[in-house]
């Protein structure tokens, strides 16, 4: 019976794998797989060949992995991983529809993300550089910040018809006109962080490939890391200390940058200027004396390193100034009126919009400490000024011009012999010179004698 079947198969087919036992073991596994898969044409020999017809698939290691995955699928044509469906069909089937599936998979991989992904938020993300924002970008950013951080009581009409350049020019006082102090810190901090992040992105991508595919792959992760890092800093920064200048700690390298200590920077200058020397201390010097020591921060403290300070307890400052000047009735009203005297002298100014806040002008202080022009002449010619009174006192002592002319001794030379030289000299003869004849030493002693 078996011999009859082999003979019949040898007549209708030239493929030895159908009747030769030597090929049975090699073809057993593909036959079982294809039978289990329920294919209607599994018996055709050209459908069983596991090798792809194209040469480019032979040397790729992906064929082995996909083949193993295919062997363990238990006859199923659907892979448990979506990204493996097209690869498996490409290697096994060899049909015309399979290359289309593979190409569609690659297009889907390199194309934009679907709407239901978490990166859908990128559709409302504005350009990285806030100075390039349009009015619509400013509106989107403001709406996003309100929803993201739960900000309330913001006058959105204040930001209408405002582009990115105008937004970046706003300072803290401008934001306070549209919202509260807390919202101002949040908006200013995030705006400053975006500007620094744009500089970081420009520096890292200026010498790299700018293709669109790299941008699609890198932008979602960069945006998520940037927003996550800023959120962490906001949660820690707003609970610890107020932000200075709209930027808390983020630098160009996304590392925390500590704020400089104003007491270390301004401390030596404050101590030097606060020392009045032998004279009485002035009010502005007294304030610098308090600011030179951080232990006085409970009543007066620096606000940054630009000379701005604030009286946290103005009554205590006035009380200490009253003790120094022995004025027990001193209060802040009297002290503030005394401070106005320094405005015209450019020693300090009042910070507008802030209570009990002032700012020292160190350049004006340096000019105020310069010696007066009349005082400089006292030190420019000290010998001449000290010489003249001594010279006249010397004349009175030696009685150079007596009351009676007869008492004046007469020498062999005429006393007025050199009168013409005396009055025609360049110095008008105010001081004696060697050309004028002198009397004996008993009457006109030398000016360098015992009287000096």
UniProtKB/Swiss-Prot annotation:
Residues 112-198 form the PNT domain. One of its GO terms (molecular function) is sequence-specific DNA binding. InterPro entries: Ets_dom, ETS_fam, Pointed_dom, SAM/pointed_sf, SAM_PNT-FLI-1, WH-like_DNA-bd_sf, WH_DNA-bd_sf. Expressed in both hematopoietic and nonhematopoietic tissues. SUPFAM superfamilies: SAM/Pointed domain, Winged helix' DNA-binding domain. Residues 246-257 have a biased composition (Polar residues). GO terms for cellular component: cytosol; nuclear body; nucleoplasm; nucleus. Keywords: Activator, DNA-binding, Nucleus, Phosphoprotein, Proto-oncogene, Transcription, Transcription regulation. Induction: Specifically up-regulated in leukemic clones with F-MuLV insertions up-stream of the FLI-1 locus. Gene3D superfamilies: Transcription Factor, Ets-1 (1.10.150.50), Winged helix-like DNA-binding domain superfamily/Winged helix DNA-binding domain (1.10.10.10). It holds the Pfam family SAM_PNT. It is found in: Nucleus. SMART domains: ETS, SAM_PNT. Residues 236-260 are annotated as: Disordered. The modification Phosphoserine is found at residue 39. PROSITE patterns: ETS_DOMAIN_1, ETS_DOMAIN_2, ETS_DOMAIN_3, PNT. PANTHER family: ETS, FRIEND LEUKEMIA INTEGRATION 1 TRANSCRIPTION FACTOR. It is linked to Involved in erythroleukemia induction by Friend murine leukemia virus (F-MULV). Sequence-specific transcriptional activator. Recognizes the DNA sequence 5'-C[CA]GGAAGT-3'. Can form homodimers or heterodimers with ETV6/TEL1. This is Friend leukemia integration 1 transcription factor. It comes from Mus musculus. The gene is Fli1.
